[in-house]
Amino acid sequence: RALKTREDIFDIYVQPIPWGKTSWLWKDDDERRNIDFLLAKTIAHIDSGGKFDVSLQVTIPNEWEKLAPINIGITAGIESDKVSAKWLESCNMMSKVLTISEHSVKSFTDTIYDAINNQTGEKFKYCLQSPIEYISYPALKHEPVNLDLDLTTDFNFVTVAQMGPRKNFEMTVKAFVESFKDDESVGLIIKTNIGKNSLIDRENCKNSLKVLSRSLGDRKCKIYLLHGALTEAEMGGLYTNKKVKALVSTTHGEGFGLPLFEAAYYGLPVLATDWSGHLDFLCKKVKQKNNKTKIKPMFGKISYKLAEIPEHAIWENILIKESKWAYPELSSVKNNMLKVFKDHGRFKKRAKELQNWVCKEFAEDKIYDKYVKAMLDVIPDDLMSSSPTWLNEIEDIIKEYE
């Protein structure tokens, strides 16, 4: 999207890559049709022996390659406080690294390994050497689409979290049930999946929730499972539903935290772990009279302790054993949920203030301009002054006809 704002200087090609077990999403709109056109264009270009001047590789760093003279790695970074040596090695192959939050930058720049030069035997400190900066995601507000959620409760929390160790959604459920087990007017909507949006995945989610719910004892409060792919407009409908009062996240860590960001720019109060990438947009920067900038938290801060990630969460070359992430405190989660329930007006007023700031600070054109500038910073002037490949090809065809 950022590149398309400057098609006068960028000749764009696209090559899709798989991501785990995630399904390929499809929708019939202008953007998808353009992507399909670019895919076909890329295949034809490669088949004809075409080369590329610059590669932008949007994936985890250990999958980055030297595909062009100039290579820019784009990653959401890591959710813990330290990256793997493999990631540093991949980053140092890149002309530049772009990530998405101050937390992610810090995880890269703070990671240092003891290494040995194989040729000299000399010990040295191995760290990030390529330039790195972060550019946030843009606020992409859509006209909300009404969702028929069939809610029987008037006050509902929502959590958007894939089932897995890092999102820690079990703590969200536990805190909710222990806080509202005797109140039949309160509900928790869980927007989740395990890996896909299939019927089998839905059944597996239902079974997991049933087991978790039974372990927490009898309750009057309601738990709703929301499963399947929703459009951006439908997610907007979820965040703006009159019966949905706050989003809660007990995450161990986020590179950015897109659902929290979406909730913020739709004006929904957010309760979240007070650590990692989402602090970039949940804390408003306020200029004081002395021209100094003050960081003002605009969300329900869930207290935490920083400790090493558990054994079952280790992911080779990604989430490493010696790294740490946040462990939210159950009492703080419950306290925040009860506060927003009892004093929702105050939280909603603050959320509206945050919404106004986020929509201005993270506006699409502002974010896209930052991406374009970041790329131009590493592209030599002589390359930018030359005509794009597609223009040269068109000129050759015209000459043949002449």
Model features per residue range: what roles?
Residues 21-109, 234:
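Extended catalytic core of nucleotide-activated donor transferases of GT-like folds
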Residues 95-144:
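Donor nucleotide-sugar binding/catalytic pocket of nucleotide-sugar-dependent glycosyltransferases
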Residues 149-167, 173-176, 188-190:
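Conserved donor-binding/catalytic core segment of Leloir-type glycosyltransferases
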Residues 194, 305-402:
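C-terminal amphipathic helix plus adjacent low-complexity
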Residues 199-240, 245-246, 294:
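Nucleotide-activated donor-binding/catalytic signature segment of Leloir-type glycosyltransferases, i.e.
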Residues 243-245, 267-269, 274:
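A short alpha->beta transition loop at the rim of the catalytic pocket in nucleotide-sugar-dependent
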Residues 252:
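Aromatic "clamp/platform" in nucleotide-sugar-dependent glycosyltransferases that forms part
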Residues 269-272, 283, 289-301:
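Short hydrophobic beta-strand element within catalytic cores of glycosyltransferases
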